[in-house]
Design a protein with these regions (language model features):
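Short alpha-helical transmembrane segments in multi-pass integral membrane proteins
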Residues: 1-23, 81-146, 190-246, 302-367, ...
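Residue-level signal for short hydrophobic patches within transmembrane helices
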Residues: 12, 16-35, 39, 62-69, ...
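Transmembrane helical elements of multi-pass membrane transporters/channels
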Residues: 21-40, 142, 176, 205-209, ...
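Hydrophobic alpha-helical transmembrane segments in multi-pass membrane proteins
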Residues: 22, 26-34, 71, 103-112, ...
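Helix-terminus/linker motif at the lipid-water interface of multi-pass membrane proteins
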Residues: 35-54, 123-130, 186-193, 253-286, ...
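Small-residue-rich hydrophobic transmembrane alpha-helices
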Residues: 53-113, 150-169, 276-334, 338-340, ...
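Hydrophobic transmembrane alpha-helices of multi-pass small-molecule transporters
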Residues: 65-68, 180-185, 210-214, 286-289, ...
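Short runs within selected transmembrane alpha-helices of multi-pass transporters and secretion channels
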Residues: 74, 143-161, 169-180, 198-213, ...
């Protein structure tokens, strides 16, 4: 199949260089998405104070809980589209695209209503302090108004990734990211809108990225061209999207529930610790983007090669992804550890907030490469269409360990250090289970 200048041929030629070409724009795209939240945090931390910083930061885990089920389902669309595109099945590819975009629109509207109705209740359930809950609820409600744009962008970008195009989503996010940063400065510094201002800026930037990705799909002149008149759900392909996407979404949602539980434990230390965790958690986000971009590459490459029955090439994809992920995440983790104080000063000038952030970083950044290894094997399995068992193992290993830690160990040794040691402990246990699962599934594929 003829490739356009943005696409990558995942099924032929060398692998390592193509993985890097695929992953690097995806990594930069993820960083830009994080910059939406990072700019929010930096601007409110510098110009609106520690309470506003804590208010914005305390919403992160909750927003992820609400949205990650549907974002996980977009992985199902990515896997199915990659498989059809590699096999040259144009009609099936078109039906998948229109089903995915329709699903994104519906889920975005549903999430907007859910966020507007349940934001404050969920924040109260997490024990958000009275001095920040009003601002937190306001930020969440405005943020969720932009959920249809957020969903449409993510599902559209998933289709582009399926055909090997990670460059145009990066361009779209550069444009919307610049708009976000400029609007933050205008609305917060000039108009003193505080958390409402940064939320409005984020929604507008999401609208712009949504328009750009939809325009790209509508003008593509390929099997993945989008026609608004054809928007409808094909139940056959919706079922296949759900088979891969729902377990991935449930896994992400449940893991973020455990993070929300951890956030509630941090809340018990007060707004200073909350602000420190907010800044540290944003740094975690940048580390996760590095490992997640490689996982996305592994899933897309595996799916296309699985679609054309190049099983030995799938193994080489996994090995090369492991090398890239470990080297990248270990290097970045060490950088975050050794330069943690300087990085945290970008977010806040409060020395107590910086101290709390450093305590959290000291136990989580260097071993972050374990998180990368933990995510790669489920990514490869999803690329082969196996999503249920990896989801169960991730929930048991990651969430189970953290729940036992929070309720069994933390109450007897109340400190941020003890709380966050649960991260590397859960990663190690999950790796053991996921590698074992991959070994048995891969043996079955080899026999096919």
């Amino acid at each position: 199949m003829k490739q356009n200048k943005y696409e990558i041929d995942m099924c032929n030629g060398t692998i390592m260089d193509k993985l890097i070409s695929f992953s690097l724009p995806l990594m930069l795209s993820g960083i830009l998405q994080l910059m939406f939240n990072a700019v929010d945090i930096i601007v409110v931390g510098r110009f609106s104070g520690s309470q506003a910083l804590a208010a914005v930061g305390s919403t992160t885990a909750l927003i992820n809980v609400f949205t990650n089920l549907f974002i996980g389902i977009s992985l199902g669309a990515n896997v199915l589209a990659a498989r059809f595109y590699a096999a040259g099945k144009d009609l099936e590819m078109s039906d998948t695209v229109h089903t995915a975009v329709t699903l994104a629109l519906v889920s975005g509207i549903v999430m907007a209503f859910v966020g507007l109705i349940f934001s404050r209740w969920a924040l109260e359930l997490m024990g958000t302090p009275d001095d920040v809950i009003g601002q937190s609820a306001l930020y969440m409600k405005i943020y969720f108004l932009g959920m249809p744009f957020f969903m449409l962008y993510n599902y559209g970008a998933a289709i582009l990734r399926a055909v090997g195009d990670t460059k145009r989503p990066l361009i779209f996010l550069v444009i919307s990211g610049v708009v976000n940063a400029v609007l933050n400065l205008i609305l917060v510094i000039m108009f003193h809108m505080d958390v409402a201002g940064v939320a409005i800026a984020t929604v507008i930037s999401q609208l712009i990225s949504c328009i750009l990705v939809l325009r790209c799909l509508c003008t593509s002149k390929t099997s993945y061209q989008l026609h608004f008149g054809k928007l409808r759900i094909n139940t056959v392909y919706l079922k296949q999207i759900f088979q891969v996407g729902i377990p991935a979404g449930i896994q992400s949602t449940v893991i973020n529930l455990s993070n929300a539980l951890l956030q509630s434990s941090v809340n018990s230390f007060g707004s200073t610790a909350m602000a420190g965790y907010t800044a540290a958690n944003n740094i975690f986000g940048f580390l996760y983007v590095a490992v997640n971009s490689v996982t996305q590459a592994c899933m897309s490459f595996t799916s296309q090669n699985y679609g054309v029955h190049k099983f030995k090439r799938m193994d080489k994809v996994l090995v090369d992804c492991l090398i890239i992920s470990v080297v990248t995440s270990f290097s970045l983790g060490c950088g975050a550890y050794f330069f943690g104080s300087e990085i945290l000063k970008i977010y806040t000038a409060d020395p107590e907030v910086i101290r709390c952030g450093l305590e959290i970083l000291s136990y989580t950044t260097v071993p972050y490469f374990l998180c990368g290894i933990m995510d790669l094997f489920p990514g490869a399995l999803r690329g082969m269409g196996h999503s249920g068992v990896p989801m169960i193992l991730s929930v048991i290993g990651t969430v189970g360990t953290r729940i036992v830690w929070i309720f069994g160990i933390f109450p007897h040794h109340r400190s941020l250090a003890v709380l966050f040691i649960s991260y590397p402990a859960s990663w190690m246990l999950t790796i053991i289970m996921q590698v074992t699962c991959f070994y048995f599934v891969r043996r079955k594929v080899h026999r096919v």
